[in-house]
């Protein structure tokens, strides 16, 4: 039996409905799963979706919003968050096997008074999965983050021995699930030159190195050297200390669409690795390849997790 995958449409002012409509036309997607769509269905239909065989849960965003130019709005935040809540309820009740989330707008959530910084933060705090791990997957890259959406000035405060240990443990488990044959992992230092042995920074010496002593297959390197070695294919995964340390090389060097995967939840949750793209929303030119891969990856892992 095909896994049931809940697909949320994200912020209705963005490209979520468009990339979902395009993904639902993929033969591979329809063979891989039974989709359940949650969000503003009118937006989905505006991109030619009319398949009555697909079960939809409508979360209307309102006519007033649709007359405005694509931008962050309170209404968009409320609707996208409600869709996520519905999908989460279905997943935790076992009514779906996985969730794929189209992009939300964090500013819209902020305008709506929603305190979470994104999907991953919502799952961690609402359902008490503090160690749920943000991972990015493509054909040639498997990358995990220690810290995520925060000011760069605060990154070092969040890199603790406990956090580093949890990330390494979960990333090892995630790589086995994919599966990745090469178990060796690279860890990108926070500072240039790894702080030169404490000469100008101490995070590596005081925090990261002591935590990594427990892991024989994890190697700490300056981030430029780490990415260079990783792309040579000598390691199965790479851990980055902060967001852009991962996303810049990831989007530059990936040989296929990138998928975001939240590992450590009792179900599979993925998303395309891009945002709402307000600048092209409504123009019909959005690339759905990352969304398609997110659905296929979610379906694949959902089948594995059921066994």
Model-predicted segments: where are they?
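Contiguous, glycine/small-aliphatic-enriched amphipathic segments in soluble metabolic enzymes
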Residues: 1-119, 161-241, 245-259, 263-276, ...
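Active-site glycine-rich loop that binds ribose-phosphate moieties when present
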Residues: 122-130, 150-174
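Glycine/threonine-rich beta-strand-loop-alpha-helix active-site module
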Residues: 111-133
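Short secondary-structure boundary/capping segments
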Residues: 135-136, 177
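Beta-strand-turn-beta hairpins that frame and shape the catalytic cleft
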Residues: 138-143
């Amino acid at each position: 039996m095909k896994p049931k995958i809940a697909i949320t449409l994200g912020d209705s002012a963005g490209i979520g409905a468009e990339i979902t409509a395009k993904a639902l036309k993929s033969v591979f997607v329809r063979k891989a799963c039974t989709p359940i769509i949650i969000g503003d269905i009118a937006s989905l239909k505006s991109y030619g979706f009319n398949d009555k065989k697909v079960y939809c849960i409508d979360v209307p965003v309102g006519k007033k919003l649709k007359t405005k130019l694509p931008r962050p709005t309170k209404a968009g935040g409320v609707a996208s968050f409600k869709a996520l809540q519905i999908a989460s309820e279905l997943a935790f009740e076992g009514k779906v096997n996985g969730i794929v989330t189209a992009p939300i707008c964090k500013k819209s959530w902020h305008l709506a008074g929603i305190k979470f910084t994104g999907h991953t933060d919502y799952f961690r705090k609402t359902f008490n999965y503090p160690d749920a791990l943000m991972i990015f997957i493509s054909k040639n890259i498997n990358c995990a983050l220690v810290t995520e959406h925060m000011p760069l000035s605060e990154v070092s405060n969040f890199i603790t021995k406990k956090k580093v240990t949890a990330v390494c443990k979960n990333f090892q488990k995630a790589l086995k699930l994919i599966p990745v044959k090469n178990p060796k992992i690279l860890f990108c230092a926070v500072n240039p030159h790894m702080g030169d042995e404490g000469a100008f920074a101490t995070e590596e010496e005081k925090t990261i190195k002591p935590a990594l002593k427990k892991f024989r297959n994890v190697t700490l390197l300056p981030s430029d050297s780490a990415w260079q070695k990783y792309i040579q294919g000598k390691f199965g995964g790479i851990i980055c200390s902060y967001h852009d340390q991962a996303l810049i090389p990831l989007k530059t060097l990936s040989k296929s669409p990138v998928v975001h995967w939240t590992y450590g939840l009792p179900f599979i949750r993925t998303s395309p690795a891009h945002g709402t793209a307000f600048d092209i929303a409504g123009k019909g030119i959005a690339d759905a390849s990352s969304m398609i891969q997110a659905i296929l990856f979610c379906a694949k892992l959902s089948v594995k997790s059921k066994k």
